[in-house]
Design a protein with these regions (language model features):
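Sec-dependent signal peptide recognition
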Residues: 1-8
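Intrinsically disordered, compositionally biased glycine-rich interaction modules
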Residues: 185-197
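Mature-region segments of soluble proteins
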Residues: 89-91, 95, 104-188
Length: 197
């Protein structure tokens, strides 16, 4: 049984070779550093989290953003073929944390195309689109962006709130209440989903 599982995994990996495994490895390492820093920030209370995230922006996000700019200018948005599915997801996650509006905007079209080709999972796509809109002071579409206010997570302004779950379902996401439960567990903070904005 173990042998056949290993054989299947080896064959699957061979069927989808990455043409740039070094870039994939670099993206995964960058992602790991990013996530470790954010997990450390999640351990504090609301105010401590905000301070920690500001420090993370300086220490982690700015250098990562410089490298993402280099990658995008050299290769465009990386594909599954170039860096594998996990490499694409790592690039996307790092891009969401990048303090560079121009880069994020340039990547929107290729990310949307990759999502339609099923190279990007629904939650990663929703997070990207929503965060981009919120940073432009526009209502989000999928309800994935929350802010820390008064020591709790509050969903950012969301377009057409009553049809939110329909939009989420259309792209393969669970209802907003399920997502809120996961956020509460991860951040150990109360979660608020306003009925109206």
């Amino acid at each position: 049984m173990k042998f056949s599982l290993i054989l299947i995994l080896v064959c699957a990996a061979a069927a989808f070779p990455q043409t740039d495994p070094a870039l994939r490895d670099e993206l995964l390492k960058m992602r790991d550093v990013d996530q470790k820093a954010r997990e450390e920030c999640a351990k504090g209370n609301g105010d401590e989290q905000i301070k920690c995230l500001a420090e993370t922006l300086e220490k982690v996000d700015k250098p990562n953003t410089a490298r993402l700019n280099e990658i995008f200018s050299q290769q465009g948005f990386p594909t599954n073929k170039l860096v594998g599915k996990d490499g694409v997801e790592a690039f996307l996650l790092l891009l969401q944390h990048a303090p560079d509006e121009t880069l994020r905007q340039k990547c929107l079209k290729p990310i949307t195309k990759a999502f339609k080709r099923k190279e990007i999972p629904p939650m990663a796509y929703a997070n990207y689109v929503d965060r981009l809109l919120v940073r432009q002071n526009k209502p989000q579409i999928y309800g994935s962006n929350f802010d820390i206010k008064g020591g709790k997570l509050v969903m950012s302004e969301t377009r057409d709130r009553k049809n939110l779950d329909k939009r989420r379902r259309r792209i393969g996401l669970p209802p907003i209440e399920e997502y809120a439960k996961k956020l509460k567990e991860f951040y150990n903070l109360e979660v608020e989903i306003p009925d109206q904005f």
